[in-house]
């Protein structure tokens, strides 16, 4: 292919197409967008709230600055699996990309059979990469984030606090709930939950406490008495 990002401008009479990033060579070099940057094996693209572009290319997640001047690598280095920051993180054929309102990026990591989350995009150590779903086994299995299994997840889209994954070899669309909620029933002042199974809890919007990492961030309770919340595991769910 041309290994380039192209820009299309519709002026009403014509569509004007120009090169935006990539010098046409197959590779992984960062640098000035048109003269130096190499964008081999381009797959997908998303745009953040500041108009920066992010693409999957050559086992990496690459960023094209909003002004179109530079290309940099925010995560990934070579084909493998590892969570971490910047180039310490590794992917195997990152394919689909999605982005939420807080500029967290989600990646369907095909050959690792996992769904990855990229956050802290401006960190000096590189963006943070963590696995939010998938055991890595080539299999079909529903369950909590480290129990679920995929067979070749090739695309992902974000909507209303959930990810929807095209699980190609399973011929299914899978849902990953990334904003879990816990319910304290009306009139009840004590509740016990196992963090590992929180995704399976049915909830209603008028009686919820949202749990993100180790922080209870809100809730509207039917009871006016003090609430006791007991968690049975110290293993944290992903953000």
Model region roles, listed by residue range:
Residues 1, 10, 58, 110, ...:
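Short loop/turn segments immediately following the C-termini of beta-strands
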Residues 52-55, 104-107, 162-165:
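Conserved beta-propeller blade signature
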Residues 152-179:
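Blade-level signature of beta-propeller repeat domains, shared across WD40, Kelch, NHL, RCC1
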Residues 47-50, 99-102, 158-161:
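Residue-level detector of Asp-centered blade-edge/turn motifs that repeat once per structural unit
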Residues 12-41, 68-95, 123-154:
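Gly/Pro-rich loop segments of beta-rich domains
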Residues 2-6, 61-62, 113-116, 171-174:
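Structural signal for beta-propeller blades
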Residues 177-239:
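Short boundary segments that mark the start of a structured unit
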């Amino acid at each position: 292919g041309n290994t380039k990002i192209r820009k299309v401008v519709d002026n009403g009479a014509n569509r004007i197409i120009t090169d935006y990033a990539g010098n046409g060579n197959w590779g992984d070099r960062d640098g000035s967008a048109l003269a130096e940057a190499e964008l081999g094996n381009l797959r997908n693209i998303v745009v953040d709230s500041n108009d920066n572009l992010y693409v999957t290319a050559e086992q990496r997640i690459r960023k094209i600055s909003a002004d179109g001047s530079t290309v940099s690598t925010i995560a990934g280095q070579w084909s493998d699996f590892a969570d971490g920051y910047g180039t310490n993180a590794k992917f195997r054929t990152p394919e689909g990309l999605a982005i939420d309102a807080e500029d967290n990026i989600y990646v369907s990591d095909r050959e690792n059979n996992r769904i990855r989350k990229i956050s802290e995009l401006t960190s000096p150590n590189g963006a943070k990469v963590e696995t939010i779903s998938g055991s890595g086994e080539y299999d079909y299995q529903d369950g909590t984030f480290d129990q679920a299994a995929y067979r070749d997840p090739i695309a992902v889209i974000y909507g209303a606090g959930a990810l929807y994954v095209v699980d190609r070899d399973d011929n299914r669309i899978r849902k990953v709930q990334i904003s879990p909620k816990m319910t304290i029933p009306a009139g009840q002042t004590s509740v016990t939950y196992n963090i590992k199974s929180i995704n399976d809890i049915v909830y209603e919007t008028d009686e919820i406490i949202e749990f993100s990492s180790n922080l209870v961030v809100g809730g509207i309770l039917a009871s006016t008495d003090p609430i006791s919340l007991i968690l049975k595991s110290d293993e944290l769910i992903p953000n």
